[in-house]
Regions:
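Short glycine/serine- and small hydrophobic-enriched flexible loop segments
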Residues: 212-220, 234, 238
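Glycine-rich beta-alpha junction loops
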Residues: 3, 30-32, 76, 106-108, ...
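Short acidic, glycine/serine/threonine-rich loops at helix termini
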Residues: 9-11, 38, 111-114, 181-185, ...
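Conserved N-terminal subdomain of the carbohydrate kinase-like
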Residues: 1-109, 255-272
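Conserved phosphate/ATP/ADP-binding segment of small-molecule kinases
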Residues: 113-192, 199-201, 221-226
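Short glycine/threonine-rich catalytic loop with a Thr-x-Gly-x-Asp
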Residues: 196-214, 228
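Residue-level signal for inorganic ion chemistry
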Residues: 70, 137, 207
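Charged C-terminal helix
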Residues: 226-272
């Protein structure tokens, strides 16, 4: 997805990845004025046919073998999801080592479900089994796993239920820990959590930036998924702190580049 004002979707992910030294080929699924959560938005959804055409163009251009990772976010419709899934298959055919990372955007605790119900089944039956990594928030983790997610322990149980469908790694955000929040990584080799203070800010897109940073670190010099977890959480928390301090309505990506500044908060992932 893409917005003209603010930093969500590709407007949140492209710049951090480029700043980390990665070439990025954004494929938009919507073009909006700003995040709908702020109200009064205008724009349009990109058709499944147009998404397919862009992905086909990349294939014809002969660049897919250079694709080291795919990061999928907002789909909005099952037809678009099917077009994206076809793109995943083309990338994997060109580069079997490419990482497929999927942020299963369905909703959140504040707004509930904000996509068509049919997308839940699409993720469960098609996208999640085909992905290597997924990035659900607490609401999405509970919805997709069928488990009540109320703390780190229950998040791990829910993540393992989702992993039984195929992905090797689940990274859950916004998991409650008393008055704090945890980001929990569950993989086939272990579980880790990073706990951060809860901040009050209206900004959108923190999850999008986090997913991009984690993928960027894994493709870069982070030697483990857990190291990438700690770095990505630290960077995003720093952005949210600055947004809260300055009473901003959008993430200040233009002002404070993640993955570059010395973090105010540098938590070490806790091995569970």
């Amino acid at each position: 997805s893409h917005v003209a004002c603010g930093h969500v979707g590709n407007a949140a992910t492209v710049y951090p990845l480029q700043h980390m030294g990665h070439e990025v080929w954004p494929v938009h699924t919507v073009l909006l004025s700003h995040h709908p959560g702020h109200g009064g938005w205008h724009g349009a959804h990109i058709s499944a046919g147009d998404v397919t055409a862009v992905l086909k163009g990349l294939k014809v251009h002969g660049v897919l073998e250079r694709c080291a990772a795919i990061l999928t976010g907002y789909l909005g419709a099952v037809a678009v999801g099917k077009a994206v899934l076809s793109g995943w298959n083309d990338v994997r055919a060109a580069n079997p080592n490419a990482i497929v990372a999927c942020d299963p955007i369905l909703g959140d605790d504040a707004e509930g479900l904000y996509v068509p119900d049919a997308l839940i089944a699409f993720y469960l039956d098609h996208a999640i089994p085909a992905a290597d990594v997924i990035f659900p928030n607490r609401f999405e983790l509970a919805l997709l796993s069928g488990h009540d997610v109320r703390d780190i322990t229950s998040a791990v149980v829910a993540a393992r239920a989702i992993m039984a469908r195929g992905p090797s790694t689940v990274i859950a955000t916004s998991v409650p820990v008393g008055h704090e929040l945890a980001t929990v990584l569950v993989s086939t080799i272990g579980c880790w959590a990073v706990v951060t203070p809860r901040l009050t800010t209206p900004v959108k897109g923190a999850g999008d930036v986090f997913a991009a940073l984690w993928v960027g670190y894994v493709l870069g010099d982070a030697n483990t998924a857990a190291v990438a977890l700690g770095r990505a959480v630290s960077d995003v928390h720093g952005l949210l702190e600055r947004a809260a301090d300055e009473a901003l309505k959008e993430l200040p990506l233009y002002k404070y580049s993640p993955a570059s500044a010395v973090p105010r908060f540098a938590p070490a992932p806790l091995k569970l």
